[in-house]
Regions:
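Phosphate- and other anionic-substrate recognition elements at nucleic-acid/protein interfaces
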Residues: 2-3, 10-140
Length: 140
């Protein structure tokens, strides 16, 4: 089963889609938009084109596990996604994904504008990889 993960942001939203078996990240993209409706419509288009059957969305949590200050904004966007796509997003803990994405890009000599254009897609890939690992470890 294909799964899509997103790293929602004010100006850029990273997208990662698994391979057909749901084992690893297959493709990534970045949606450039400051308008939640436009972002949600683009996610819907990508869901349809990819055939993804599940949507995972990074959700902000503090290091102690409580909801972060932007949680209500993310919940509102998740509700908008469900309304537009007909698919309820799974809210997935995104703690440290952007930090890890920056580290990965630094180690691979991505700097400046090149890094800015890639960090959201890498963060979405990390969200997806975390979710896929969870599924592998919790098979019934």
């Amino acid at each position: 089963m294909k799964i899509m993960a997103i790293d929602y942001g004010d100006a850029r939203t990273g997208v990662a889609i698994s391979d057909a078996l749901g084992w690893m990240t297959g493709q990534t993209a970045v949606i450039h938009s400051r308008k939640p409706e436009k972002t949600a419509e683009e996610v819907a288009r990508m869901l349809n084109e990819s055939g993804a059957e599940r949507l995972v969305m990074g959700f902000p949590r503090n290091m102690d596990g409580t909801e972060g200050p932007r949680a209500s904004l993310y919940r509102d966007f998740a509700a908008l996604l469900e309304q537009i796509t007909g698919m309820k997003p799974i809210l997935w803990d995104e703690r440290r994904t952007t930090i890890e994405a920056h580290q990965i890009l630094s180690e691979n000599n991505y700097h400046g504008k090149k890094r800015k254009n890639a960090v959201d897609a890498v963060a979405a890939s990390l969200i997806l990889e975390g979710y896929l690992a969870y599924l592998r470890n919790h098979k019934e």
